[in-house]
């Protein structure tokens, strides 16, 4: 699996670590960062993963040079003072950089697991 990590969620920093979860966030493994690694810039990373064909949720998170780790959507909602998903002002959805989960179905199709 190859993708991009966006450091902008930190508000100002350089990505130093990217972790990937292939089990819905229960466990995390380090990905390999690719050069160039620049401040406030997209950083490509690689993560070798063999998909066994079972439905799963895959997601990545990054940590910057200040030690700030990207929040899950629930951690972000709590920081904003929301107690449950239904109370979230959906117009704010474009203004956050929470961990983005992606659902991979048995047929290989990929859908947004956060807002779908």
Regions found by a protein language model. Give the residues of each.
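Short, small-residue-biased leader/transition segments that mark boundaries at the very start
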Residues: 1-6
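Long, low-complexity serine/threonine/glycine- and acidic-rich segments characteristic of extracellular
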Residues: 9-116
């Amino acid at each position: 699996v190859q993708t991009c990590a966006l450091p902008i969620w930190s508000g100002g920093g350089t990505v130093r670590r990217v972790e990937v979860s292939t089990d819905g966030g229960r466990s995390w493994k380090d990905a390999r960062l690719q050069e160039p690694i620049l401040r406030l810039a997209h950083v490509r990373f690689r993560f070798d993963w063999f998909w066994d064909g079972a439905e799963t949720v895959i997601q990545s998170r990054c940590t910057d040079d200040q030690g700030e780790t990207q929040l899950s959507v629930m951690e972000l909602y709590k920081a904003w003072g929301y107690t449950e998903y239904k109370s979230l002002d959906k117009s704010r959805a474009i203004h956050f950089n929470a961990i983005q989960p992606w659902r991979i179905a048995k047929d290989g199709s990929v859908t947004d697991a956060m807002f779908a």
